[in-house]
Amino acid sequence: MSDFQHAQLDWDENGQPLSRAFGDVYFSRHSGLNETRHVFLATNRLAERFAALGDGEVLCIGETGFGTGLNFLCAWQLFEQVAPAGARLEFVSVEKFPLAAADLRRALALWPELAPWSEALLGQYLAVHPGFQRLAFAGGRIGLTLLLGDALECLPQLDARVDAWFLDGFAPAKNPDMWSPALFAELARLSAPQATLGTFTSAGFVRRGLIEAGFAMQRVPGYGQKREMLGGTYQGPPANAGKPWYARPAPHAGRRAALVVGGGLAGCASAASLAARGWQVTLIERHPGLAREASGNPQGVLYLKLSAHGTPLSRLVLSGFGHTRRLLERLRRGHDWDACGVLQLAFDAKEAQRQAQLAAAFPADLLHGLDREQAERLAGVALPAGGLFYPEAGWVHPPALCQALAATPGITLLSGRAVRLRREGDDWCAYAGDECLARAPLAILATAADIRDFPPAAELPLKRIRGQVTRLPATPQSRALRTVVCAEGYVAPPRGDEHTLGASFDFKSEDLAPTLAEHQGNLELLREISPDLLQRLGADDLPLERLEGRAAFRCTSPDYLPLVGPLAERAAFDEAYAVLARDARQVPERACPWLPGLYLNSGHGSRGLISAPLSGELLAAWICGEPLPLPRAVAEACHPNRFLLRDLVRGQRG
């Protein structure tokens, strides 16, 4: 990712952008709008296909070369004009050199007709960093997944079934890598049966390459002065489904209703993602209200713990950060959240070395190093060291995010009732005692480590880690703190009249009553972050017994990745794939014995603000047969079946 960069543009006398790297235009100098409508919308017959969609049906468009977003905006405009109200559009686009936000705004200003759609895109076009980035519009009716990086690196990571292709890279003579047999093979792998394709080029080697990949291609009249272009239909075989234990369950058909058990961030996000797709969701919380456990802290930190080595966890964090950061735009800045930035101090030599590797691996608008003087100037208080600054990050009031997600139309909240689930016919039923409170064909467990109270998930290796935060009254002097500062702990600028600092880690205690010892420990973490801030707060003079705070349990897994996705029935799984205990390289051709309609969203540890909301989108994609919003390898690394598979291969149970 160290070579990731925004597009370098020149602007012609008419204010139109040109790529400096490829020496080519982004769209026709005569009429980019009409060109898009002819080459991509008409060739793919999108007007009639959009109009024919049924309630809850989705059409997926794939694109090579997002560029200025013009094709996406034109498709969205047409969809709104002709598609039935209950239909949805998914758009997946790969782009190696995304435009900077200011350049995108300048380019889209050329098309006043598209202003409502352009403004919506620009409003979500933030925290757009390498990898998969998920954006949503029109209350979730329009989904955009940007794959930011080289097409031949990104597309093999994509799990999707594309109904229509826009091939819109720069001209083959200028950008030959975008028109290679390897890319055509990826288009074929990702294509739904009879997927259509349109492209402005009529180059013979492109036509022959697409035919070789399984597309029936023909030359058709081009736009404007271009005599010919290409259109086609995929007629090749369907792609191999891959390992059956990670294969998609059959997309849900029938009544679109779901139960979500758990009113924390994972549950609220899961409910919101389904409700945005037209589902009726019953959100069940055993406490009197939402966000009463780990999601109930007054301030959480939107902090990216990344790796320079592209691990699944690091890629999840990078994609999840962008998604959450865009969600936060719905909330009240300064009260519910603040993009004040996060400064991670280089508190020892090992941490300084790690930070140097990260600064070399990621773009500067995501993170960059500061020396001590720069860090102090930015933070507003004296610090023991410089560190790594994340300018788009900050603090969040998690209950506000939970409330906003749970307010999505289509969600009904049942609070104050602990339930157990029982399968009855084609439904999951939520029972409180002998009373069935709600029923639906699909259920999502989002109760952190307590998902193990439900028999199908009882053997999953989740553990609870107690954490305590301390609330300190702000003083006139402490209000100088302008950014979150982290070392082994963290301290945030004040929300209202209080700072939050923490958080402790206790692997043994099951007691949620705040302790004086952990308040003292949090003050020591603050002393390591900034003795100056400790003094400004007068913390040494505050009686410990008068300090306020709260404790909750984080839920984590052995590999620190969450559990997100469908779950198999364990005994049937062991029987179906017993051969793996003898030879883990085998891939038996046996369908996974899924527990019908049961999904999990749990195990987010201390990263829930970043990973839980995007995990709601991942669940919805699993359920609805949509493009996964994460690389397939990352989705598999988060799959609940990974632990069933691990135990089978190792000859272990439980």
Swiss-Prot record:
Chief localization: cytoplasm
Region of interest called tRNA (mnm(5)s(2)U34)-methyltransferase, as start-end residue ranges on this chain: 1-235
UniProt subcellular location: Cytoplasm
EC number(s) per entry: 2.1.1.61, 1.5.-.-
Keyword field contains Flavoprotein: yes
Catalytic reaction equation(s): 5-aminomethyl-2-thiouridine(34) in tRNA + S-adenosyl-L-methionine = 5-methylaminomethyl-2-thiouridine(34) in tRNA + S-adenosyl-L-homocysteine + H(+)
A GO term for molecular function: flavin adenine dinucleotide binding
Keywords tagged on the record: Cytoplasm, FAD, Flavoprotein, Methyltransferase, Multifunctional enzyme, Oxidoreductase, S-adenosyl-L-methionine, Transferase, tRNA processing
Keyword Flavoprotein: yes
Alphabetical GO biological process terms: methylation; tRNA wobble uridine modification
Extent of the signal sequence: none
Entry similarity comment: In the N-terminal section; belongs to the methyltransferase superfamily. tRNA (mnm(5)s(2)U34)-methyltransferase family.
Protein name, as recorded: tRNA 5-methylaminomethyl-2-thiouridine biosynthesis bifunctional protein MnmC
Protein source organism: Pseudomonas aeruginosa (strain UCBPP-PA14)
